[in-house]
Design a protein with these regions (language model features):
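Macromolecular interaction modules
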Residues: 1-264
Length: 264
């Protein structure tokens, strides 16, 4: 696939749980203020999108015991932002300073919990076809669904080994199915700045952790039992990594309260 001048370098993955009774106002605050004021107005932040896990989608998450969430019902909203390659340090410094400014200005929303807020280094991506959607456009495409897969490398294995397994074994089979993804990306955790907000959890075993984002042009729950419901066992069977989490999300509907009554 031809490379153009805009390339994804790093990404911000923010999974949050609004406190019950505050979900509607949280949703409105986030998309009408924080989505833009917290990230999108920043230099080198070239894309962003929001996803939601309804109650029925959370029921598909596994395993129940995961470092990603304290329990499967937690982590209803996911926001992601793309940062231009070569400008992570510039963006990161601005981002931390900006969020402190928003706190001081009273523009934050205390009735919510950060479940998993982590910066990731984008490593590689794989579209279904050679002329498919590049990762740089994934958040602008409005994919109907997203499946998040998380794992940790086992001793003696490298991220390159898992890339080869995904490219050569898992993806060719999945791309040919109705439940399979249109685009797969792979990322590894980055450290937060020392003065990042204290309520943002840090990642354990970061050097072995990986995040796969599987963008789907269909309902992510479709064909679950034969598809993503087996991803964990397939990853474990590869011998390369320990499976930590698989979870489906769907697009939010900007400007509406859609899905706020389906979270729990």
């Amino acid at each position: 696939m031809k490379q153009y001048g805009i390339q994804l370098g790093t990404l911000l993955f923010i999974m949050v749980e609004p406190w019950k009774g505050h979900e509607v106002e949280y949703n409105r605050w986030y998309e009408r203020d924080h989505f833009y004021g917290g990230c999108m107005v920043g230099a080198y932040n070239f894309a962003g999108d929001r996803f939601v896990a309804t109650r029925s989608l959370k029921e598909l998450r596994y395993p129940a015991d995961s470092p990603m969430t304290p329990e499967p019902s937690v982590g209803s909203y996911l926001a992601m932002y793309w940062v231009l390659k070569g400008h992570h340090d510039d963006w990161n410094r601005w981002s931390v300073d900006n969020v402190h400014m928003l706190h001081a200005a009273g523009r934050m929303f205390p009735e919510r919990t950060h479940v998993h807020t982590v910066l990731y280094q984008h490593e590689w991506s794989l579209p279904r076809t050679l002329t498919g959607t590049p990762i740089e456009l994934a958040l602008d495409r409005d994919y109907a669904g997203l499946v998040v897969n998380v794992g940790e490398l086992r001793g003696g294995h490298r991220h390159e080994d898992l890339e080869a397994w995904t490219r050569e074994q898992w993806s060719p089979a999945a791309f040919g199915t109705d439940w399979g993804p249109d685009l797969v990306s792979y990322a590894t955790p980055l450290p937060l700045l020392d003065d990042a907000p204290a309520d943002v959890p840090r990642v354990a075993n970061a050097e072995r952790r990986f995040l796969q984002l599987h963008f789907c042009d269909h309902d992510p729950a479709a064909g679950w039992d034969d598809g993503y419901g087996r991803f964990g066992e397939q990853l474990e069977a590869s011998g390369l990594a320990t499976h930590l989490w698989t979870a489906p999300f769907k697009q939010t509907v900007f400007g509406t309260d859609t899905y706020t009554d389906e979270l729990w």
